From Swiss-Prot:
Keywords: Cytoplasm, Isomerase, Porphyrin biosynthesis, Pyridoxal phosphate
Molecular function GO terms recorded: glutamate-1-semialdehyde 2,1-aminomutase activity; pyridoxal phosphate binding; transaminase activity
Gene Ontology terms describing biological process: protoporphyrinogen IX biosynthetic process
Family: Belongs to the class-III pyridoxal-phosphate-dependent aminotransferase family. HemL subfamily.
Highest taxon listed in the record's lineage: Bacteria
PTM sites of type N6-(pyridoxal phosphate)lysine: K265
Pathway(s) of this molecule: Porphyrin-containing compound metabolism; protoporphyrin-IX biosynthesis; 5-aminolevulinate from L-glutamyl-tRNA(Glu): step 2/2
Compartment(s) of residence: Cytoplasm
Oligomer and partners: Homodimer.
Reaction catalysed by this enzyme: (S)-4-amino-5-oxopentanoate = 5-aminolevulinate
Name of the protein: Glutamate-1-semialdehyde 2,1-aminomutase
Amino acid sequence: MTTSAQLFEQACRHIPGGVNSPVRAFKGMERAPVFVERAQGAYLYDVEGQRYIDYVGSWGPLITGHADPDVLGAVRSRLDDGLSFGTPTAIETRMAELICEIMPSIDMVRMVNSGTEATMSAIRLARGHTGRDKIVKFEGNYHGHSDSLLVKAGSGALTHGEPSSPGVPASLAEHTVTLPYNDLDAVRACFAELGDEIAGIIVEPVAGNMNCIPPQPDFLKGLREICDVHGSVLIFDEVMTGFRVALGGAQAHFGVTPDLTCLGKIVGGGMPVGAFGGTREIMEQLSPLGPIYQAGTLAGNPLAMAAGIALLEKIRQPGFHDALAERVATLCDGLEARAREAGVDLITQRAGGMFGVFFTAQQRVDNFAQATACNADTFRRFFLGMLEHGVYLAPSPFEAGFMSSAHTPDDIQATLDAAEQVLATLENA
């Protein structure tokens, strides 16, 4: 038994499923999860001392790689001053200014402790602002695990075959209308029937929790137009895409302006954090200015603010995101070429610094139904083979991959060399 397997067995005695987030359990992969000891740059090092080229990056935050010296230095510089105060600080104001500067759709922003808190708070704000109850979301889009949004969700809920969860009251779920992603006609039909009851639409502008599914042309623009006509709030969940698809997020990349934006991951530089922001008109309805309540004991934590500011300042340098997208293109084009040579049905999809690998004969994957129709068993064998060759991909066919600026051309070439060997074993899949 490996050390990781022993540690997993031990963890299962006191942690449900042995993990603190379900996708980490490697469920369906027929092996224990990798227990990581440390990480540096583009690499993970497990408890056995094995090194892996990492394309998970702590599920997205580590866009400059693990243990970035500038980010760690910023945290160290604050550490001796205290961990948390429960008071306003200058550093949280600097973070707010920086976010508003980078994302022009955000006039005001409030920090929270997770992406789930960000989306939950944005939904409450949209409902309070409009005086309506219903929220539209999309199949396979994951917006955290709050009750209102854990309906036909992606991410771990999709991997585990739980498109909704026991414990979510029907009285809450009935206010969530779930539609097919990338289907504007379905959205129009929904609003034709229920438009005066719909507080808002929440959407992943690039769906990253059913692998990586970019929006079809005009999908996001169409959502904006529908919300404008019906007086509903358009919420972009940019927890994953914010500062990664482009510096200004997917909204900058696709040229569509939401009313509210949810952020997380990169904004904390690897520390637990989230944020939501938007127009002054809507955000000023939050307590203590307005009647809509939201709070958090550790929100705006100074260490998280220091880490996030250091990272944002680093990635806003000219050319950073272009170089990241070039790395992704090299990897994805190389994977497709090697799959063709091996006779394996494989396509990739990408958006900025994120990408997806689909084992399918389809030319494109646009929605939940098409994502779940891909060959999950072939993915499982590919994942395990790549792991044996020292490449760490997301342990689920429904999670996006993430590139960092720490990945070198040699890392990408080593990944493609490993893929060539593994794909050769899948030829008759």
